[in-house]
């Protein structure tokens, strides 16, 4: 039962205490409205947390993208910050894409989420609301990281998270419900990380004081309309890049070359190793009569491989650093 609703973000609460905490949090909720979406230079924000997401530097990237494109290709979709910004500008007639828009990712579950937002937004939202309401109603503090029943799961929010994580790893992966769980886990796990091991998704609970917003109905409807013509493809970069033709534009945001041994570099069980970076760089150099833009970390392997190309340094905030999440790093964008 929903008794309280935030007027700004439309998030719903069944308990007055959680509703009050939400209203009084230090960082107020700022949610896109229909009027915001009509403004010039409005960029739709991503609905997922994602390691290496480009929201904070989107303006540095978007100015390097051509205003007239044959086919648009995004080879490492992830959280979709750049794709959503490009589509926002296309909607404002500031970028012209003559033919098709392709978005690729090696994570098939992520691709399914985007596809379900395209075609099944109502049912997706119902599932999200169902699980978020159940989570929000839990008040206990007894932690069970291996619950075997819904009663054990409801002993605490943390227990419920692990119950959902197990369900996510064991259920049919092509369903709308699985995509809803993907989105739920993304906002309740540790800092939005996506990481898989031999037994599936394995990121721990995020310990958030306030029940997070998964996605508002306004944003879901707007994004569904925005991405309606995008072709989402589950594919590795080596296969995706073969689809690029003369006159096309390619944006690449691969797992970054590690700055050190502790850097987070991949979200699938296979990771993204040094040989894959070298193979990617080799394939990029084969792009002739094709415009491209790549984001990466500013390390020797990147700068040495792309000496002949244009580049620009960007200061960005680190997304995952448990000791100092507010620290910054230097990234680089490479383009031709």
Positions of PLM-derived features:
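Long, positively charged, glycine-interspersed low-complexity recognition regions
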Residues: 257-258, 267-336
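Conserved proline-anchored active-site loop of SAM-dependent methyltransferases
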Residues: 61, 72-86, 103-108, 114, ...
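Conserved SAM-binding loop of SAM-dependent methyltransferases across substrates and taxa
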Residues: 81-97
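Class I S-adenosyl-L-methionine-dependent methyltransferase module
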Residues: 92-228
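S-adenosyl-L-methionine
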Residues: 35-73, 81-82
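A mid-sequence, solvent-exposed acidic-amphipathic segment
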Residues: 218-246, 250-251
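C-terminal recognition-helix end and immediately following basic linker
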Residues: 1-36
């Amino acid at each position: 039962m929903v008794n309280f609703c935030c007027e700004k973000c439309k998030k719903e609460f069944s308990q007055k205490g959680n509703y009050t905490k939400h209203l009084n949090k230090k960082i107020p909720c700022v949610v896109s409205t229909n009027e915001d979406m009509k403004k010039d230079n409005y960029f739709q924000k991503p609905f997922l947390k994602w390691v290496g997401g480009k929201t904070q530097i989107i303006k540095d990237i978007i100015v390097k993208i051509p205003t007239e494109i044959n086919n648009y290709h995004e080879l490492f979709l992830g959280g979709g910050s750049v794709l959503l910004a490009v589509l926002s500008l296309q909607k404002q007639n500031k970028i012209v894409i003559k033919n098709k828009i392709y978005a690729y990712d090696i994570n098939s579950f992520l691709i399914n989420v985007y596809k379900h937002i395209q075609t099944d937004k109502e049912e997706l939202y119902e599932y999200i609301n169902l699980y978020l309401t159940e989570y929000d109603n839990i008040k206990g503090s007894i932690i069970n990281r291996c619950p075997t029943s819904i009663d054990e799961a409801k002993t605490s929010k943390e227990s419920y998270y692990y119950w959902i994580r197990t369900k996510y790893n064991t259920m049919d992966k092509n369903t709308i419900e699985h995509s809803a769980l993907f989105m739920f886990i993304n906002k309740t796990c540790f800092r939005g990380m996506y990481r898989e091991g031999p037994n599936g998704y394995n990121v721990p609970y995020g310990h958030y004081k306030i029940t997070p917003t998964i996605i508002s109905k306004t944003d879901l409807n707007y994004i569904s309309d925005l991405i309606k013509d995008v072709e989402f493809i589950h594919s590795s970069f080596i296969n995706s890049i073969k689809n690029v033709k003369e006159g096309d534009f390619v944006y690449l945001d691969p797992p970054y070359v590690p700055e050190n041994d502790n850097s987070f570099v991949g979200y699938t069980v296979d990771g993204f190793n040094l040989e894959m970076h070298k193979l990617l760089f080799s394939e990029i150099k084969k792009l002739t009569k094709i415009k491209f833009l790549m984001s990466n970390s500013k390390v020797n392997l990147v700068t040495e491989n792309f000496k002949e190309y244009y580049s620009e340094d960007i200061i960005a905030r680190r997304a995952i650093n448990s000791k100092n999440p507010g620290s910054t790093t230097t990234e680089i964008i490479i383009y031709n």
